[in-house]
């Protein structure tokens, strides 16, 4: 059921108030404070269409909770009635809320929870859910972003939400659409990331703000964030469910009291992806991939229903592989998800916020793929390769010539926003303190680039010959023979990667080389072999014929009368 669109079309303007005061004092800080106070006062007068929407939203959530309570008492996991209510909430969440936001609150906050509380009978659970949307909108759209108080209030609201879900005597009587559950975990980590960077920028903060931060070190503390994510994983028993699911068993058999319910199951799964993201932001790439050890990335599953979750998973796994020098795996991961985005892009354009997020990560992954392919050339899907040449052809050529500035530029654009888990010393914070986590990761990356600076040139020479005296090739490169031998050893070492071949864990693998050239040295001669595999068009056509035959059989079965 969609909230009636004609009710959006009223002529009410929430900003058009007649008032006999002047908002400009000449002092920017006073003006900003006065303006915010003014906005909060005006929202006490809530448009009728917003009142009606909130009452309808509350009734839908309340009806679902009542039905869930009944089914929990009857020892049922779910029903068609619950599914229908979840579908209605999804429509409100993805369509009605977005339309009303665009019309009434494009760059300003929704009414505060206290203002709408009488409309919903002070329903505590609904107000927690409403605040989650309220603060998320402030972070995303409101000019100037959240105040320090709003950052704290949003944290406490997430604490209330997760306490309600995790600390109940039994499963909480609540179900939400998968998209909203993913957005809750995604936003929770984003706000932690935002606060971690915010608290490090002390130059423009007042003494009062700094003292407030100093006296509240546990707010948005990394341990509390990790604790929430691990608690959701443990409560849902999701790792055991995934283990059984990937081995062909029934995950319900090991789900337990909580994990049988969609709320816990999906929050548990999304929390695994959240842990992947959080460990990547902290620079712990091994642990980032390890948390996904029961998720088989190379297969579709019943859990991969939210496109943004899929894209985020592949982005962070690919980036972690890149930083671990597992270039072949990074290239495979990026190429797979970019192909997926390319083929399903039209479905993301239905909602703007999804499209913006996926489009940004799509561009970032193209940049990371350009880096990986420059450092480890190998064959990828032709359509992705064509896109890459169009976007980064010139930059890839400059990177092949060892231009460290281009590497740094692309890394800066495409990497995640790293953060430090440590609360800063507020008595001595230098202006660039918030950049230190990024600069540390950049240094690690550029050190690796520097080690490989000569490899692209060596590779281009090796492709031209089958045998060549070591001294002669060293002369071509203007290198002393001993230094050239060291570079050849570096080439051998860097072109051999740990590569995932089979199994569930993304950390497993075998040492392989996918380099288009290989060589060995016999005394003072280099013997070179071109290992480039010619395109096998026959295999492609055979696969397409098999797919066509399977499709034909399926269509025939569908056309047969029962």
UniProtKB/Swiss-Prot annotation:
GO terms for molecular function: translation initiation factor activity. Residues 329-535 form the PCI domain. Keywords: Cytoplasm, Initiation factor, Protein biosynthesis. GO terms for biological process: formation of cytoplasmic translation initiation complex; translational initiation. Pfam families: Paf67. InterPro entries: eIF3l (IPR019382), PCI_dom (IPR000717), TPR-like_helical_dom_sf (IPR011990). It is found in: Cytoplasm. Its main location: cytoplasm. GO terms for cellular component: eukaryotic 43S preinitiation complex; eukaryotic 48S preinitiation complex; eukaryotic translation initiation factor 3 complex. Component of the eukaryotic translation initiation factor 3 (eIF-3) complex, which is composed of 13 subunits: eif3a, eif3b, eif3c, eif3d, eif3e, eif3f, eif3g, eif3h, eif3i, eif3j, eif3k, eif3l and eif3m. Belongs to the eIF-3 subunit L family. Component of the eukaryotic translation initiation factor 3 (eIF-3) complex, which is involved in protein synthesis of a specialized repertoire of mRNAs and, together with other initiation factors, stimulates binding of mRNA and methionyl-tRNAi to the 40S ribosome. The eIF-3 complex specifically targets and initiates translation of a subset of mRNAs involved in cell proliferation. This is Eukaryotic translation initiation factor 3 subunit L. It comes from Xenopus tropicalis (Western clawed frog). The gene is eif3l.
